[in-house]
Curated annotation (Swiss-Prot):
S-S pairs: C122-C128, C192-C314, C489-C492
Protein name: Thiol:disulfide interchange protein DsbD
Membrane topology category: Multi-pass membrane protein
Alphabetical list of InterPro entries matching this protein: Cyt_c_assmbl_TM_dom, DsbD_gamma, DsbDN, DsbDN_sf, Thiol_diS_interchange_DbsD, Thioredoxin-like_sf, Thioredoxin_CS, Thioredoxin_domain
Residues passing through the membrane, by range: 173-193, 218-238, 253-273, 306-326, 333-353, 367-387, 399-419
Subcellular location per the Swiss-Prot or TrEMBL entry: Cell inner membrane
Residues of the Thioredoxin domain: 430-574
Pfam families: DsbD_N (PF11412), DsbD_TM (PF02683), Thioredoxin_7 (PF13899)
Similarity comment text for this entry: Belongs to the thioredoxin family. DsbD subfamily.
Catalytic reaction(s) noted: [protein]-dithiol + NAD(+) = [protein]-disulfide + NADH + H(+); [protein]-dithiol + NADP(+) = [protein]-disulfide + NADPH + H(+)
Compositionally biased intervals (Polar residues): 152-169
Gene: dsbD
Ranges in coiled-coil conformation: none
Organism classification: Bacteria, Pseudomonadati, Pseudomonadota, Gammaproteobacteria, Enterobacterales
Length: 574
């Protein structure tokens, strides 16, 4: 009797272990989204606080948090800096663990107003949840004074979705304002600007070369500040205009138009045509400048301010490009600061010439035209950045490749005129850089390497519950595998790249009907399908037998490598 009881216990333990090993291996370890990311909120008058308690082993994506007010106006929330996170498919991002509190200022809320909060997260084990949306009822709040003052300018967060992260246009622009300083210094060495510095220096000093070094430095600095004032004002005006038309400036047709303008500005730097103010206006501004008295702080400052309005053919294109660039940001600080640093960069060589004389200036020559051409390539980087938003990442990579090949190819050809021996090493570097930049174009024209063009499973796409029922009915006695996929699911992409492409997996699935549902949009049909299948998150792969019934303990949640998945298939489909 004791022997039989012991045998039954061993059989039970063996069956339990087998189910744990080959069955629904990950389904029990993942909790519903409400438990993984417990959401709560509190409102006190104008201050609303959104709280998340994040279960250990789970995290929220910073860039996936959005708020959408209805019958209310809220200030754009500022999320705290998250923990750096990187994966193969989505690159660098920021995540939150443990707990998160986000303060939101409610500027105005009518009775019955609500705030929809959308968020998304994953488990560290490679399991991602669909975007979750919670509706927060808002207590009625009277408009603040700032809202009343700006009633003519609706808040960006009024009645439209606001993504509360650093993905605003100002944050995603490719260059920081510091680059404007370097661009200004570079423009100073173009053929239209550099030869003018000795003349401008003499005008600033009022023809008196007996001034002390301190006095000369002061006058030169004042002149540069006058020029910087004009440029800063231009930056503020353009950034403010960009702020008023922020949404329009992000539409595809505007981005394409701006890109075309940037290309024209670059062509002017290549010498195809001359771009400058009308001669009559330049003459009038020059006469105004000549009436100022050099050698005096007030007169020098006025000359600098007027000089900021007189654009030479070499400065018009870079200045126009920077102005259009900061209009994309709608950021007043960025607009004013960028143009100030640009003017400061142009003024630094003038300060050196005024204080130390012409001996610090390099000799004029063809190299100045090459500097001007190089800035044409810098301007061409801006349309590539803008078009990348419209055309998508693959075409963006190809455009960057074309620009890189063009720049390094031009630099290589230009360097062939050099006679110094050390330039041979530079030529090798330039040629190598051009070849590296050409790689995306080679892959596009001649096809990706064979190793990357692996055969993938031929899925039949379904979108609704009815599609699933029809596909199961038409399976004709074959087993069915349903793969639930979404673009925001990292492990789904890992399945696609590493598991489904493996020969042993494809052999194990031979004879099975392969279905796939893309639930990226999280639409009503997607939600209904996930609810019907009782799916918490992705990746989830479900197996059905020849009668259309789900195979017990066959469901896979979380990533599986090819050998483990092939073993699972043999145990469930055979």
């Amino acid at each position: 009797m004791a022997h039989r009881i012991l045998t039954l216990i061993l059989l039970f333990c063996s069956a339990h272990a087998s189910a744990s090993l080959f069955g629904q291996q990950n389904a029990s370890q993942f909790v519903p989204a409400d438990q993984a990311f417990a959401f709560d909120f509190q409102q006190q008058q104008h201050q609303l606080t959104l709280n998340w308690q994040i279960k250990p082993g789970y995290y929220l994506y910073r860039q996936q948090i959005r708020v959408t007010p209805a019958n209310a106006s809220v200030a754009p929330p500022a999320l705290p800096t998250g923990e750096p996170h990187e994966d193969e498919f989505f690159g660098k991002s920021e995540i939150y663990r443990d707990a998160l509190s986000v303060p939101v200022t409610v500027e105005q809320a009518a009775p019955g107003a609500t705030l929809s909060v959308t968020y998304q997260g994953c488990a560290e084990a490679g399991f991602c949840y669909p975007p979750e949306t919670r509706t927060v009822p808002l207590s009625a709040v009277e408009p603040t004074e700032s809202v009343k003052a700006n009633a003519a300018t609706p808040s960006a967060a009024t009645g439209e979705q606001t993504r509360v992260n650093s993905d605003s246009p100002s944050a995603t622009l490719p260059f920081s304002a510091f680059w404007a300083l370097l661009i200004g210094i570079g423009v100073a060495f173009t053929p239209c600007v550099l030869p003018m510095y000795p003349l401008i220096s003499g005008i600033v000093l009022g023809g008196d070369k007996r001034l002390s070094t301190r006095r000369a430095l002061l006058l030169a600095f004042i002149y540069v500040q006058g020029m910087a004032l004009t440029y800063t004002a231009l930056g503020l005006v353009v950034a403010a205009a960009g702020l008023q038309f922020q949404a329009a400036l992000q539409s595809p047709w505007v981005l394409v138009t701006l890109s075309a303008v940037f290309v024209l500005l670059a062509l002017s730097m290549f010498g195809l045509f001359t771009l400058q103010l009308p001669a009559s206006l330049q003459t009038r501004l020059t006469l105004m400048s000549n009436r100022q008295r050099g050698g005096s702080p007030g007169g020098v400052f006025a000359m600098g301010a007027i000089a900021g309005l007189i654009c030479s053919p070499c400065t018009t294109a870079p200045l126009s490009a920077i102005l259009l660039y900061i209009a994309q940001s709608g950021n007043l600080w960025l607009g004013g600061g960028t143009l100030y640093l640009y003017a400061l960069g142009m003024g630094l060589p003038l300060i050196l010439v005024t204080v130390f004389g012409n001996r610090l200036l390099p000799k004029s020559g063809p190299w100045m035209e090459q500097v001007k051409t190089a800035f044409g390539f810098v301007i061409l980087a801006l349309p590539v950045f803008l078009l990348e938003r419209v055309l998508g990442e693959p075409w963006g990579v190809r455009l960057w490749s074309v620009l890189g090949v063009a720049f390094f190819g031009w630099a290589f050809v230009t360097s062939l005129n050099a006679t110094r021996s050390w330039m041979r090493a530079v030529q090798i570097v330039l040629l190598g850089a051009a070849m590296i930049c050409a790689r995306p174009l080679q892959d596009w024209v001649f096809g990706a390497p064979v190793a990357e063009s692996q055969a993938h499973l031929a899925f039949t796409r379904i979108a609704t519950v009815d599609d699933l029922d029809r596909a199961l009915a038409q399976a004709k006695g074959k087993p069915v595998m349903l793969d639930l996929y979404a673009d925001w699911c990292v492990a789904c992409k890992e399945f696609e790249k590493y598991t489904f492409s493996a020969p042993e997996v494809q052999r194990a699935l031979d004879g099975a009907v392969l279905l796939q549902a893309d639930v990226t949009a999280n639409s009503a049909a997607d939600v209904a399908l996930l609810k019907r299948l009782n799916v918490l998150g992705l990746p989830t792969i479900i197996f059905f037998d020849a009668q259309g019934n789900e195979i017990p303990n066959g469901r896979v949640t979380g990533f599986m490598d090819a050998p483990a998945f092939a073993t699972h298939l043999h145990n469930r489909l055979r």
